[in-house]
UniProtKB/Swiss-Prot annotation:
Function in brief: Component of the small ribosomal subunit. The ribosome is a large ribonucleoprotein complex responsible for the synthesis of proteins in the cell. Part of the small subunit (SSU) processome, first precursor of the small eukaryotic ribosomal subunit. During the assembly of the SSU processome in the nucleolus, many ribosome biogenesis factors, an RNA chaperone and ribosomal proteins associate with the nascent pre-rRNA and work in concert to generate RNA folding, modifications, rearrangements and cleavage as well as targeted degradation of pre-ribosomal RNA by the RNA exosome.
Family: Belongs to the universal ribosomal protein uS4 family.
Residue span(s) of domain S4 RNA-binding: 107-181
UniProt xrefs under NCBIfam families: PRK04051.1 (NF003139), uS4_arch (TIGR01018)
Biological source species: Caenorhabditis elegans
Taxonomic classification: Eukaryota, Metazoa, Ecdysozoa, Nematoda, Chromadorea
Primary localization class, coarse: cytoplasm
Protein name from the UniProt record: Small ribosomal subunit protein uS4
Cysteine pairings via disulfide bonds: none
Region of interest (Disordered), residue spans: 161-189
Entry-linked SMART domains: Ribosomal_S4 (SM01390)
Length: 189
């Protein structure tokens, strides 16, 4: 039986020039600052930013009172404000063109966990997320690149099943508790 062809949309775009020193240094700095796994994660965010800026540029070419510009422009601005990339005081399409990659990287769950002080470092935050220790509202999230909305930001916490969140203690703690219980039982007899 023939396999069905699956159509997948692009999520990254590799750079045109593979060995450009300034770009390589900039990407390496972003990877270190935000604790990313590889360059592909940087390229994914750059591609998202490029799509947003392209939409804003196309809308800016239309007239101010054009219904398409009003409707789609407001939708784009509301979406960017909702995820916290754009400030509410700057709700104009001109400000969308000034967005940087860092604005999007700041909204990742990994960065937010580190900024809230739940992790000791940005790399520790990634490990906590991948090991199912972090939840957003009631949902455990194990994707470090999860984009946190502004209204969900105050609901980031440790999972209820996690040892950090009051769940079952970890392996070492259970062993020390057992040793403590065993030693206490021998003294009484």
């Amino acid at each position: 039986m023939a396999r069905l062809k699956t159509v997948q949309s692009k999520v990254t775009k590799s750079p045109r020039r593979p060995f450009e020193k300034e770009r390589l240094d900039q990407e390496l700095k972003l990877i270190g600052t935000f604790g990313l796994k590889n360059k592909r994660e940087v390229w994914r965010v750059k591609y998202t930013l490029a799509k947003v800026r392209k939409a804003a540029r196309e809308l800016l070419t239309l007239e101010d009172k054009d219904p398409k510009r009003l409707f789609e422009g407001n939708a784009l601005l509301r979406r960017l404000v909702k995820i916290g990339v754009l400030d509410e005081t700057k709700m104009k399409l001109d400000y969308v063109l000034g967005l940087k990659v860092e604005d999007f990287l700041e909204r990742r769950l990994q960065t937010q966990v580190f900024k809230l002080g739940l992790a000791k470092s940005i790399h520790h935050a990634r490990i906590l997320i991948k090991q199912h220790h972090i939840r957003v509202r009631r949902q455990v999230v194990d994707v470090p690149s999860f984009i946190v909305r502004l209204d969900s930001q105050k609901h980031i916490d440790f999972s209820l099943q996690s040892p950090y969140g009051g769940g079952r203690p970890g392996r070492v703690k259970r062993r020390t508790l057992r040793k403590g219980d065993g030693a206490g039982g021998d003294d009484e007899e």
